[in-house]
Structures are given as C-alpha cells and as structure tokens.
Amino acid sequence: MDFASSKKRKFKDANGVKPSKGKKSSSIPDKKSKKVKRAEPEPHDEPEDDSSDEEEQALKEVEDESDQADEDVEAANSAEEEEEEGGDEDNAENNTDLPNGGQLTLPPVAGAEAQSFEELKLSEKTMKAINEMKFTKMTEIQRRGIPPSLAGRDVLGAAKTGSGKTLAFLIPVIEMLSSLRFKPRNGTGVIVVSPTRELALQIFGVARELMAHHSQTYGIVIGGANRRAEAEKLAKGVNLLIATPGRLLDHLQNTPFVFKNLKSLVIDEADRILEIGFEDEMRQIIKVLPKEDRQTMLFSATQTTKVEDLARISLRPGPLYINVDEEKQYSTVEGLEQGYIICETDMRFLLLFSFLKRNLKKKIIVFFSSCACVKYHAELLNYIDLPVLDLHGKQKQQKRTNTFFEFCNAKQGTLICTDVAARGLDIPSVDWIIQFDPPDDPRDYIHRVGRTARGSNNKGRSLMFLQPNELGFLSHLKAARVPVAEFNFPTKKIINVQSQLEKLISQNYYLNKSAKDGYRSYMHAYASHSLRSVFDINKLDLAKVAKSFGFTQPPRVDITLGASMSRDKKQQGRRAYGSQPRQNQGNKFTR
C-alpha cells in the first residue's frame, strides 16, 4: 500500500471521514515513513505569507509558545502513558480512544447562586491559574453560564461586549479536557471558532494562561499563518483548538488529524461570523464534526434569523438560553461616557488632528469606514510627525498581529482601524474611542465603543463625528437604548493646517495617490451604507469631502453607486436597519 492511501485509511479510521477528493492531502508522515516526502497542502482560504523574517516575527512568538507547550506536555505525559498502556509505546501511539470510553465524570457544580470562582469547585490546576490571573468574582455571564456548561448543557448566550464571556466558555471546556484526561494522541476535544484572527489570537492568549498548569495541548489555526506548520501540530494532537472558520474547514477537509473525540464546540461572536460571509463554511464545519455527545456553546451579541438557523443545526434540543442584557436600561456598559460632535465635512480632518494633538498621552482608537481610508490617514499622520498605528483587513497577517500586540502593550498612543478591531478584542486601558466615520448601524456602534470601559470597574469615553446631514442617526441610537450627549470642541482650539495639507497632497505623489484611493473608498462606503435614509450620498457636498482629504478640487475618480454593490451583497440579509440596497441606478459622481 502506498503512503497516500495508507494516510487516507488512517484518517478514515480516526474520524470516520474521508479526506476531500481532488485535493492534495497535507498529511504528516508517521515515524515509520520518514523517508517519504510530504505533499504540500493547497491553501483554502488565504495564501500563505512567505514574506520576510521581520514580518513573521509576531506570529513566530505564538508558534514558539505553542511548540513549548507541546514539548512540556510530551514530557509530562510520557510516564503516565507508559503506566496506563503497560509500557507498549506503539499501542499508546495508535490508540486514539479516550480512557473509560470518554465518560465524563465532573464533580458536582455550584448553582446559579455562586458569586466567586472558589464556589464553583473547579480543579486545583484551573483555580491556580484563575488566581494568577487575579480573577475572584464572576461577571453575570460567567455566573449564569459556567455552572450549566460544566454540567454539559448546550448554551445559547447573549451578552454585550466586555462581559467576560471568554472565561465563561473556556473554563468549562478546560475542566472537561482535564476530567477526561485528554492526551495529544486523543486528538482534538474542543474547537473554538472565532470570526477574526485578532480575536482568535486573544482567545488563544487567555487559554494559554488558563492551561498553564494543565497537561493538555492547545493550538491555533488562522488564515494568513503558516498552514504547513499548523498541519504538523494538528497531526501531533491539539486538544483545545482555536480557529477562524475558513482555515478550520480547510484543515477538516484536507489535513489528517484526530477529531472523532470532539466533546465541545464553541462558536463565539456567531452573528459576526455570519455577517462577514462564513455561513456556508459554518454549515460545512458543523456537518463534518461529530454530533454524538457533543456539547455546543453559541454566543452572539444579536439574535438574527441566521443566528437562529445556525443554533438550530448546531445545538441539541432544549439548550439553555442566557441573555444578561434584556433587563438592562442601556445597551452599552456602565462607566462609558458617550458623546457626538457636529462637524462640517471640510473640518473633519482638522478636528481629528487637533483632538489627537491635544491627547498625545492618551490611548485612543479611531474607526474609519474602509481600508483605504485607514491607509491614507495613517500615512498622512505619520508623515506629519503624529505617530499612529494602523490595522485593517488588507494587511498581511504578520503585520496585523504585530500591530495588535504592540498597541495592547502600549500605555499611550493612537490606533486607526476599520471594524476589524470592533468585535471582541480586549485591548487594555483604552481612554477614547473616536468614530471618525459613522458605523453601519447601532449594533456596530455598540461594538466599537465596547473597546473601552471594559471590565467591572473601568471607565472610558467615546466620541462620534456627525455631519449636519447625519443627525438622524441619533434617533436610531436612542431606539437601541444607547445614551449619547452632544460634545463641543471650541472652534478657536482647532489647529488650522488646511493650507499645509493641500500643499502636501499636491506635491507628494505617494500621498496624493493614497488620498485619492481614500476619497474613492470613502464615497463607495457611504453609497453602500445600510441606513441610506440618514447617510444619503446625494446630500454630500463633494467639494467639502475632497477638501477633508487635502484636495482643492474633487479628484477625477469614478464613484459609481453600482461599483459598491459588492459590499451590499455582504450586508444583505443581516441588517434590520435601513432600507434594502438600491438597484444599480447608474448614477456617477465624477469630477
């Protein structure tokens, strides 16, 4: 039997699922097949990044930590495996079944009245990690979610951002892995699916701390990372796996690894996963994964029709529904001071520049509507000696990872970004959230401002820029139980650098090109806004918009409304706000 067919047979034996036909297998040779050359896997969701060593440094740190965890586990488990298997190493390597047939025997758990982690009667190893992380009292989602999850219940949870749900799902699954004595050879027992790479990295970091004293393995697979290295680790055995949907489906279909023992599936930020176009991938993932005795926990900030459909196919009948926000007066967290400022279109950049200059010692996140807008403003601000970091979806993964951790570790500074940073990310000590471009609807607003005032005793402030024609958005925020007040920024305190800006843009070829791209993308984003009754492109003064980008006259760019319909397709079916996308009207605003 040749090597490829033997690996397919081994994969089938381990999981009862055949590798996808017509694609190369990213198989990892076993110890008896060292001389056989490995087949290169074909990327499924994003191409592998083969850029410079400097760009790979950020992800390398995560990979090194995962490698070290694997080494520690192998050393810790070697004696136990010899004892349990009677010293038969070959049998231990090939036997992927769980001890005791995978029967879960967790200690009695505390009821909903438990207030502290101590009352949950968790394992000594988990409690030691929680104490080292300085957690004592539970948040509401933890108090209501952890006990039933420890008991094996399926959970459908709704909680606002910053509520502590990461611990709410990680603690129960780690306890389960420990109770079942999972080892690398048993394969993957828990999969956590996250919408974005940054959120997946963040969950991975929390899992690493919680599992510091446990012997089980953990790992992460995300788009843009080294797929071959991921496949090798999966073949060795990753008990707790954090993943983004596209890369997870890729490995499930093309990488031979053991997942027949899967006991728990966690879907975090389910509404966001569906919003960004991973509905088909999630359906395929759920279809491939074992269903028998599998616990599923699904968390979503909003309960849309698509989320309900996903819950229906993934959860067992009679799940526990937890909504910690239904009785709250406001949809945003306490300790958050929220406001807006009315600003003429041509003054928007000057106001932003003046605000950032006055708050150089603060930690600030500024949200823009498109990648090109982020790129232009980052290049411009850094060029004029106002240092900022930038984060958006068109960057290479190494760059995104490096920027994310650099800003997390910074005590002060400014990050300008798209909504890639708006969901779930726990960035410490953010003082201000600036929404330079308006969000697509109140739900996105809530997630943006959720990057500050996180935790039980933290404070934070947010500021939204609104043009005079956009004030109708305030009524939508009010309907969504979001309290905002008008802020004033004295005109005399605005630093007028308009003439210098226009001179710079006219003379610097690269900034001019970047400004033109930003202008075009801003108009496209505005044209495809879901709340078109409020954000009407026909009401924009294009001369003022151009001026805010540093042009004396609107540049000659095609900003056909129909050109933005690809973005509309991503929005359709997920928005409860605003009108349906318009048909291609063929209107052009070309200068």
Swiss-Prot record:
One of its GO terms (molecular function) is RNA helicase activity. Residues 45-92 have a biased composition (Acidic residues). Residues 580-591 have a biased composition (Polar residues). A motif (DEAD box) lies at residues 268-271. Its EC number is 3.6.4.13. Residues 335-495 form the Helicase C-terminal domain. Belongs to the DEAD box helicase family. DDX18/HAS1 subfamily. The Q motif is unique to and characteristic of the DEAD box family of RNA helicases and controls ATP binding and hydrolysis. This is ATP-dependent RNA helicase HAS1. It comes from Gibberella zeae (strain ATCC MYA-4620 / CBS 123657 / FGSC 9075 / NRRL 31084 / PH-1).
